[in-house]
């Protein structure tokens, strides 16, 4: 009794003869030197031949040049990606989403010159029952993982925009210039909070009624409309008038220009709360009225910057 082998020598021979090594020079400029190109007829014997590209050293097979591009673009080891040869001149961008030919019109590409920054790594995870390898781009500092370079680029761009926004907010919150004082005619509206001893101040521009919540906002506004310069800021000094109280409990005070501001004032903080000071100008103590006015100005300055 004879048994028939499931894989006879003649069948193996036919399978080997069907694999044809193609001339790699026909793909010159599209693949790196050393790659092997194999033409493999389909088992249906309908004359269709599939082309496979074999990576030297690893033996990995790729069914398209696009798959090779994605594979090579993701190979980094904590260094910036480098691109060499004419292979990288044209189609070097990596896309995410559907990879079928019908959907290529809707794919999203990373920028042509995009590189992984330092501190990133690439993980390769082979799929089960498949020759396909999934790549994950990992930010080591945070542990965040991304499936494509375009996702990494989008994440970095959004993070950069967020940092720039925070910097703009911090710049807007900066205090006003040290020597800045309200111009003549401006009104300060002080309104005590109901559930707190804190007093909210608003600075009102005469004529327009524009209201600002801080001295820094007033200074930025005056600079933007061209009503103030750095020289005028450094020369402006003001003396506060007594506060006025209306029926609603809102206090108002105006600012006037002191035509002869002192060049130097020697002062020392006093009082239990540290909100009073004694002042000496040209060897003489200032009057109690002036000290009281300056004390209010000093407390207001501290609260504006807090």
UniProtKB/Swiss-Prot annotation:
- Record-linked SUPFAM superfamilies: DNA-binding domain
Which positions fall inside the MBD domain?
Answer: 21-92, 106-171, 172-242
What keywords are annotated for this sequence in UniProt? Chromosome, DNA-binding, Methylation, Nucleus, Repeat, Transcription, Transcription regulation
Q: Superkingdom of the source?
A: Eukaryota
Molecular function GO terms recorded = enzyme binding; methyl-CpG binding
Per the UniProt entry, the disulfide pairs are none
Keyword Metal-binding annotated: no
Q: Where is this region: Disordered?
A: 1-21
Give the classification, highest ranks.
Answer: Eukaryota, Viridiplantae, Streptophyta, Embryophyta, Tracheophyta
Q: Where is the composition biased (Polar residues)?
A: 1-11
Q: Which GO terms describe its cellular component?
A: chromocenter; chromosome; nucleus
InterPro entries from the xrefs? DNA-bd_dom_sf, Methyl_CpG_DNA-bd
Q: How is it modified after translation?
A: Methylated by PRMT11.
Tissue-wise, where is it found? Expressed in leaves, buds, flowers, stems, siliques, mature seeds and roots.
The region called Required for interaction with PRMT11 is annotated at 163-306
User: What domain comment accompanies this record?
Assistant: The methyl-CpG-binding domain (MBD) functions both in binding to methylated DNA and in protein interactions. The number of MBD domains may affect binding affinity, mobility within the nucleus, and subnuclear localization. The C-terminal domain (232-306) has a very strong chromatin binding affinity and thus is coined 'sticky-C' (StkC). StkC confers intranuclear immobility, but has no effect on subnuclear localization. It is necessary for the interaction with IDM2 and IDM3, and for the anti-silencing function.
- Mark the residues carrying the PTM Asymmetric dimethylarginine: 118, 145, 174
Quick one: where is this thing mainly located? nucleus
Task: Quote the subcellular location field of this record.
Answer: Nucleus; Chromosome
How does it associate, per the subunit comment?
Answer: Interacts with PRMT11. Interacts (via C-terminus) with IDM2, but not with IDM1. Interacts with IDM3. Part of a complex made of MBD7, IDM1, IDM2 and IDM3.
What protein is this chain from? Methyl-CpG-binding domain-containing protein 7
Function summary: Transcriptional regulator that binds CpG islands in promoters where the DNA is methylated at position 5 of cytosine within CpG dinucleotides. May directly affect chromatin structure by inducing intra- and inter- chromatin compaction via bridging over multiple methylated CpG sites. Acts as an anti-silencing factor that prevents DNA hypermethylation and gene repression. Requires high mCG density for binding. Recognizes preferentially mCGs located in transposable elements. Required for active DNA demethylation. Prefers to target genomic loci around chromocenters.
What if the gene is knocked out? DNA hypermethylation and transgene silencing phenotype.
């Amino acid at each position: 009794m004879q048994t028939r082998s499931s894989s006879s020598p003649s069948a193996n021979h036919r399978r080997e003869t069907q694999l044809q090594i193609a001339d790699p020079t026909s793909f010159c400029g599209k693949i790196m030197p050393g790659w092997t190109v194999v033409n493999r007829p389909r088992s249906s014997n309908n004359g269709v031949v599939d082309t496979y590209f074999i990576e030297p050293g690893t033996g990995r097979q790729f069914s398209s040049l696009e798959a090779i591009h994605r594979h090579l673009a993701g190979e980094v080891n904590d260094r910036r990606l480098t691109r060499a040869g004419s292979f990288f001149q044209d189609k070097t961008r990596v896309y995410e989403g559907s990879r079928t030919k019908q959907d290529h019109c809707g794919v999203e590409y990373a920028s042509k010159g995009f590189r992984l920054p330092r501190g990133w790594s690439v993980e390769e995870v082979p799929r089960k029952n498949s020759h396909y390898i999934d790549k994950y781009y990992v930010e080591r500092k945070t542990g965040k993982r991304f499936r494509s370079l375009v996702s990494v680029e989008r994440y970095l761009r959004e993070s950069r925009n967020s940092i720039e926004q925070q910097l703009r907010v911090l710049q807007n919150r900066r205090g006003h210039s040290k020597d800045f004082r309200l111009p003549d005619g401006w009104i300060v509206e002080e309104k005590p909070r109901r559930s707190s001893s804190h007093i909210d101040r608003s600075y009102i521009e005469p004529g327009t009624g524009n209201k600002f919540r801080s001295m820094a906002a007033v200074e930025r506004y005056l600079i933007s409309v061209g009503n103030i310069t750095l020289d005028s800021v450094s020369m402006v000094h003001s003396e506060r008038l007594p506060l006025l109280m209306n029926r609603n409990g809102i206090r108002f005070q105006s600012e006037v220009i002191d035509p002869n501001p002192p060049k130097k004032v020697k002062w020392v903080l006093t009082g239990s709360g540290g909100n009073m000071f004694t002042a000496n100008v040209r060897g003489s103590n200032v009057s109690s009225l002036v000290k009281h006015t300056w004390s209010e100005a000093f407390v207001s300055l501290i609260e504006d910057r807090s």
